[in-house]
From Swiss-Prot:
Residue ranges of the TM segments: 7-27, 117-137
Family: In the central section; belongs to the AAA ATPase family.
GO MF term list: ATP binding; ATP hydrolysis activity; ATP-dependent peptidase activity; metalloendopeptidase activity; zinc ion binding
Stretch list, region Disordered: 612-666
Cytoplasm keyword on record: no
Enzyme Commission number(s) of this protein: 3.4.24.-
Protein name as catalogued: ATP-dependent zinc metalloprotease FtsH
An individual GO BP term: proteolysis
Periplasmic side: 28-116
Natural source organism: Burkholderia pseudomallei (strain 1710b)
Keywords from the named record: ATP-binding, Cell inner membrane, Cell membrane, Hydrolase, Membrane, Metal-binding, Metalloprotease, Nucleotide-binding, Protease, Transmembrane, Transmembrane helix, Zinc
Length: 666
């Protein structure tokens, strides 16, 4: 609607210019008056064309400049000066032979009516009237565009009246704690007298904080749907325009609309676009965004706690919000939505599969265990991708193989069937991934390996080793981190042992291993030589993984050198441990690599048999009922800090755009 209004001024000006040009075109090249006798000579000589014969006048053009030679010098000069076409005009006299002459010389002519003063006036009045009408319509349409000066300060939130949000708490799963906290808000909106009778004050504002895709907006709509009250939905970026004072005016207008429909809910999505901490810019004194934020603070102080208007907002960057916005009395209640655990993921999947047709072999528990770290939006996407995959194969229902493909695609990207690798590269990749898988199987604190593949996927992954945590963990021990270092270096060391050379494919492994070792030394106090002091970056990152928000090392140069030396020591010790293991288990390494070269994919059960040198059956149908997953003890979500080692990938060195771990979203 706003873009349509933005076109209006341009359209009006364009129409006016076109009409004006047409008028000027009719007035251009004025006709030169000549005598009728000269006209008769030119007609007899066949020097005329395009005649227009009216009851009182005859107009036309000369066929060439040389035809003007038959005219008096003054008329000839006037015609030439006017330029092409050489137009002339003469007063018509009674001449019965004129038509015969024109017919004999083959001159084109047509009849016309005389111009009247009414026609001339209409030719000017009509364009002006059209212009005025369009301009008036534009001004009277309150769309808030650049030409709509009267409505530029009006807020235009989406308003869902009563329970028409279409969402209630039954549509929300996996975040039971957040729903429980909001039950009080719903109860107040349904029966405010219950709280006012005892003098209680409902929170003025509720701030929902969570990573992208965790369901913040959905939760706010569910509150309105449960309470059955109007729901004003807008975003933080919609308040700020190019005009000074527009944002503040829209904030005032939004709260005025809400007061008229109380009890109701105002929901501002992406609050960080509006509520950033003030004074951070060079021109902060005249910053339009700061004026808008100031007005929001004033409005939140202005309406009463029991007025029935509740402000809800959502953000995934709470660390950059202004402290004045977060104090009690404004956003009194902060609700954090974390990534769902195993039970939460299963509940979320059960909601999303209600509208799809599932096969008898689909096990939501196994799917939940295979998607650690996934948020609600990720799980919804997996269900949709599985449905699309099944539809492409014309299946009557979605089975586990469709979900397997959807999960692999979400973790590592689309399978790159068009990428053709040489036999030498395949051998390198197979031994690299075999090294990761073998070390993961031999370490007591390593997560089980779900799948090993040398099929290229995504932008840069040439192969991957997919690990899935066995349980929800929020604290990691030093022994677990050391085992993870070993797994990350398994691919690189395997190349050294088998080929006596190394490749560029371990780039991502080395980056992650170095980062993990740095955290152990500088943040977690896991180095005896450095001690218990921490020298890590200030924790300003919050939920937004932006590198520019991180500070530098808070230590002296000598301490930084010692930290670097300790990181090198940890990596060197991990390298030695991995090297000893792979040399001792060289046979298992070759068996895994050989199986990968033949079949391209190894699942958990086959990997265990290959490591233990047991007979390996040919690849066939997957174990019914998720037996493989049950035997492997595959469980739930990754630990929080540090980032989960979900997979080790061999990456294409020519594609450095994506160095993130595709296997387990963080």
């Amino acid at each position: 609607m706003k873009s349509e209004t933005g076109y209006m001024g341009f359209v009006v000006v364009l129409v006016f210019m076109v009409l004006l040009a047409l008028q000027l075109a009719t007035l251009s090249a004025p006709a030169t008056q000549i005598a009728y006798s000269d006209f008769r000579k030119l007609a007899a000589a066949a020097q005329l064309d395009d005649l227009e014969v009216s009851p009182t006048r005859i107009t036309g053009v000369l066929r060439s400049a040389s035809a003007a030679a038959a005219l008096p010098a003054s008329d000839a000069e006037a015609i030439k000066r006017a330029g092409t076409p050489w137009r002339f005009s003469t007063k018509r006299v009674t001449d019965e032979r004129l038509i015969d002459t024109l017919a004999a010389t083959g001159t084109r002519y047509r009849g016309a009516d005389d111009d009247t003063w009414i026609g001339t006036l209409a030719s000017w009045i009509v364009p002006i009237a059209v212009f005025a009408l369009v301009w008036n319509l534009m001004l009277r349409r309150p769309r808030g565009g650049l030409q709509d000066w009267s409505g530029v300060g009006k807020s235009k939130p989406r308003v869902y009246v009563e329970a028409k949000t279409g969402i209630d708490f039954d549509d929300i799963a996996g975040i039971d704690e957040a729903k429980a906290e909001l039950q009080q808000i719903v109860a107040f909106l349904r029966a405010p007298a219950r709280y006012q009778r005892l003098g209680g004050k409902i929170p003025k504002g509720v701030l929902i904080v969570g990573a992208p895709g965790t369901g913040k907006t959905l939760l706010a709509k569910a509150v309105a749907g449960e309470a059955g009250v109007p729901f004003f939905s807008t975003s933080g970026s919609s308040f700020v325009e190019m005009f000074v004072g527009v944002g503040a005016a829209r904030v005032r207008d939004l709260f005025e609309q809400a007061q008229q429909k109380a009890p109701c809910i105002i929901f501002i999505d992406e609050l960080d676009a509006l509520g950033k901490v003030r004074g951070a810019g060079l021109a902060s004194g005249n910053d339009e965004r700061e004026q808008t934020l100031n007005q929001l603070l004033v409005e939140m102080d202005g309406f009463q706690a029991n007025s029935g208007v509740i402000l809800m907002a959502a953000t995934n960057r709470p660390e950059i919000l202004d402290p004045a916005l977060l104090r009690p009395g404004r956003f009194d209640r902060h609700i954090a939505i974390d990534r769902p655990d195993l039970t939460g993921r299963r509940q979320i999947l059960s909601v999303h599969v209600k509208h799809v047709k599932l096969g008898p072999d689909v096990d939501l528990g196994e799917l939940a265990s295979r998607t650690p770290g996934f948020v609600g939006a990720d799980l919804a996407n997996i269900v949709n991708e599985a449905a699309l995959h099944a539809a492409e194969l014309d299946k009557p229902a979605i089975d586990m193989s469709d979900f397997d493909e959807a999960i692999d695609r979400a973790m590592t990207g689309m399978e790159r069937k068009s990428r053709v690798m040489s036999e030498r590269e395949k051998i390198t990749i197979a031994h690299h991934e075999a090294g990761h898988a073998l070390i993961a199987q031999t370490r007591a604190h390593s997560d089980p390996v779900k799948k090993v593949s040398i099929i290229p996927r995504g932008i840069a992954a040439l192969g991957y080793t997919q690990q899935v945590p066995t349980e929800d963990r929020y604290v990691l021990r030093k022994s677990e981190l050391l085992d993870r270092l070993d797994v990350l270096l398994g691919g690189r060391v395997a190349e050294e042992i088998v080929f006596g050379d190394v490749s560029t494919g371990a780039e991502n492994d080395l980056e992650r291993a170095t980062e993990m070792a740095r955290h152990m030394v500088a943040r977690y106090g896991m180095s005896e030589r450095i001690g218990l002091a921490t020298f890590g970056d200030a924790d300003t990152q919050g939920l937004s993984p932006l590198v520019w928000q991180r500070g530098g090392e808070r230590c002296s140069e000598s301490t930084a050198t010692r930290i670097d030396d300790e990181i090198q020591r940890l990596l060197a010790e991990a390298h030695d441990r991995v090297s000893r293991t792979l040399k001792e288990r060289r046979g298992a390494l070759e068996r895994i690599a050989g199986y990968l070269l033949e079949h391209e994919v190894v699942d958990h059960d086959k990997l265990v048999r290959l490591v233990n040198d047991e007979p390996t059956p040919e690849p066939g149908a997957r174990d019914p009922g998720g037996d493989a997953a049950k035997r492997s003890g595959i469980g739930a979500a990754p630990a929080k800090p540090p980032a989960e080692v979900g997979s080790a990938e061999l990456r294409d060195p020519a594609r450095k755009a994506d160095n993130a771990d595709h296997s387990v979203p963080q």
